[in-house]
Amino acid sequence: MSFTDKVMTPFTPVEVEKVDGKIKVSVIGRTYTIDNGEFFSSIVANGEELLASPMRVVGTEDGEEIVWKVRRTIIQSHTNERAIIVSALESKMFDLNISYEFNYDGLVNCKLRIMTTSYNMAQRLRLEPWPTWKYQLEKLWIEVPMIKEKTSLYSQYPRSDIYQNGEVLYKNAAVRASGDIPEGNIHLPFKALFWVGEDERGLGFVCENGKNRQPIDWKHHVELEENGDERIVRYRLLDSQPVTWDDPRHDATYFFRPLSFDIGIMATPVRPAPKTPFIHNAIQILVNDNVKELAQPIEGYDNHFDFLKSLGITTLVLHETWNLVQNYPCLDQETEASFAWLVKEAHKREMKVMPYFGYEISSLSPTFENDFEKFRTKPRDYFMDATWWRNPPQRDFAVCQNSEYSDFLAEGIQKLNEKYPFDGLYLDGTIYPRGCVNAEHGCGWTDPYGNIQATYPIMGARKLLQKLYSIFEPTGGIINYHSATLNFVAMPYTHMGWTGESIQVDLIREGAGDFPIGFAKTEWTGRNLGVAMEMIAYPNPPKWTIDHATGLGLVHCIIPRPFYPRMNWENVKYLAKIRKAIDKFPFEKADFFPYWRKNDIVASNEQVKCTYYVYEGINGKKQILLFCSNLSTKEALNVAIPLDGYEMKVLNTNAKVNDDGSFDFGMYQCAIISFTER
């Protein structure tokens, strides 16, 4: 397919500057500095420093702390797309080589190679005595001292329990995939993706596998340790002599092979965050063999298209059932005819169409036997195979993005788009990097004890998104990611995220009463990552209603996307009213004030949270868009919100029906039931 490796919009070429021994590498919104040390001395993201002190490689050799001497740091190559820098370090007994590949989107692929040092020439000629080194490497860690106030939030994958002092602090749960970092020190098992930051910026770490790692135990692959004004992110690579170096031969200089450790580092946001958090007004619709029902009259309109247009809908998101064969990009005749008609009718009304493509290969696919084994994700545990069932009756199996399926899917989508130009993609789980041991496409690896371990296809998902982005970005299309993890490595090549589905089961069953707000602050605002967000919500009254979803969402800059028929038309119209009120506000010129920061506008009842945007016009008058929500399970009565100094006529444009709130001398008075918005 036509895929470019060139710098794509909105990114800028990689810039490299070497001054006084410092090498600065800048990409859009971020700067990494190597200052003659063993790792980064500075990482600036979104205008602010993340590191409290330089990153470091910590180790112990023969019982003594390793002291590294940096011998050379070299700019190996530099193009618009990437820069490669290598560093050579040595200690008393070991040599360390580090290779950095800086990509224009901000991902830095780091490779550490440690090996035993050799004898110098004088020792070889017996002019100096041979050293009696044991070459014992008892410890090797990477430590990242971050500014503590920049590390209030986390995100993890694979999801697991979170431990403190060896005991479970948080049980593994969907709502614990991301959240507030607790006080004290914590430790976690292996993480393929790990992000630490706050609501405007952060630092991500990526490891596709755990090759050569020997932490003290499986619960201590990653640690967060408080140290005054620092929070240290620690990767325990080794806590004992490498098993592969367990060699009876005496001359370790020749018989101990280099150990390699790969770790990717990526400061966020991965692209400039959009000024407006609401980049389109979409509805997800369930279409299959009844697609022509969209041509039927509804609510006094000649057809569904005109009705949706009247509600302000700009984008039709097609549920998976639009394609009779799940995810197969070569459409059958019936699906192709329906899709061509739908795109034509939507475009007549200047509405966009985003069809669904997911993460599976279908048993209904005509090439299933040929493709299944080589494309599929093969988990370590056979019984953990990810499958789906849908009508017409078919089984759908998760594919691995490290396989050739990625090329097959991208090429099929490109051909379909050339034939019936559409406006973007609804990617369901496509960038979710399931652990895979399928050797047919290169996944899986064997540890020193003979056990097969999983590869997490993070880079494969990233490459697929790069290909799809190159198709749709030039024409103004929208690519979403919809995943149960924050795969920040692939996010540069998306425009928005659709979040919330992974936690719907909990919300549907239990309601939002115990919802950990840290999850929302991490995954919903999008400002820390650089992409707009939209909520997927499936109401289940009375425990989980559209009111609850909207109230929980708006104070985190996210709004539920209507989904018909899972939401009735009344819910769709309700959300449309809110969107029409929101769309009047000039987000591009406004400042953002989330409730979790110290702001001027605070409700009299601490149960009620206020998030708002302020725009000051050329006449000096301030306009405000204020979202208030009671994030508790109790009703908040007689709530007062101070709004003196703002244009009340703007504030009084309240999207709620039958608003019984009132303004009195710059104070807004109202009552708010639990988990609803004003």
Predicted segments with their positions:
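Aromatic- and acidic-residue-enriched segments that line the glycan-binding/catalytic groove
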Residues: 329-337, 361-389, 435-448, 493-502
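Active-site-proximal substrate-binding groove within the catalytic cores of carbohydrate-active enzymes
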Residues: 457, 462-653, 665
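Active-site-adjacent "subsite" loops/lids of carbohydrate-active enzymes
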Residues: 293-298, 337-339, 344, 353-420
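An acidic-aromatic substrate-binding cleft motif
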Residues: 1-34, 260-329
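Active-site neighborhood of glycoside hydrolase catalytic domains
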Residues: 398-495, 504-506
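C-terminal beta-strand-rich structural cap/linker in extracellular carbohydrate-active enzymes
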Residues: 260, 658-678
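The substrate-binding groove and active-site-proximal loops of carbohydrate-active enzymes
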Residues: 281-298, 319-336, 390-410, 421-422, ...
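Beta-strand/loop-rich accessory regions of lumenal/periplasmic or secreted enzymes
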Residues: 2-256
